[in-house]
Design a protein with these regions (language model features):
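Core catalytic alpha/beta fold that binds nucleotide/phospho-ligands
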Residues: 1-167
Length: 167
């Protein structure tokens, strides 16, 4: 299924609702869908959804970026501003042992690629960050996987100080 990712600068004064309305309008124009109900609601776990359920969405923000991914199928989006501080301890605590070994071998340079891949996947599944975050791996001996349990992971090149992944 096609996914549309809309990115906004956080200094953009529009509300989350108006940003989502613009993203849904862009998606609807591109894929010729109708979604007149652009009312944002939240599931008990905090995952946002559109009242009409005609289009799935995922929202993320970090640093100066805010983004929204839209698709007819479940979707997960994560944006991270790269910060070097504390990545080793975070990886040791939250990542799968295979991922931690991979990061040790690569000097933790791919930490944010792995983090955004993992977070986009758990947003895709609707689980969010739970105790199961270390139960799955997004790497093998060759590096970052292109999919996890049949769900495609796609890193989106953008500004060098950010990592963005959609699942």
């Amino acid at each position: 299924s096609e996914v549309v990712v809309s990115l906004f600068h956080v200094r953009d004064e529009r509300t989350v609702q108006s940003r989502i309305e613009e993203a849904v309008e862009d998606y609807s124009r591109t894929y010729k869908t109708e979604d007149s109900q652009v009312k944002l609601l939240y599931e008990s776990g905090g995952k946002p959804y559109l009242e009409s359920r005609a289009v799935e969405l995922s929202i993320s923000h970090s640093g100066e970026l805010w983004g929204c991914a839209l698709s007819k199928e479940p979707v997960g989006l994560d944006i991270q501003l790269i910060r070097e501080k504390g990545v080793c301890s975070v990886a040791k605590r939250f990542f799968h042992p295979e991922e931690y070994r991979y990061l040790q071998e690569t000097g933790f340079s791919d930490f944010f690629s792995l983090w955004t891949a993992k977070e986009s996947y758990v947003k895709f599944t609707g689980e969010g960050i739970t105790d199961g975050f270390s139960a799955f791996s997004v790497v093998d001996s060759q590096g970052l996987l292109s999919s996890v349990n049949g769900a495609e992971l796609k890193l989106i090149p953008f500004l060098p100080e950010y990592r963005i992944c959609v699942c």
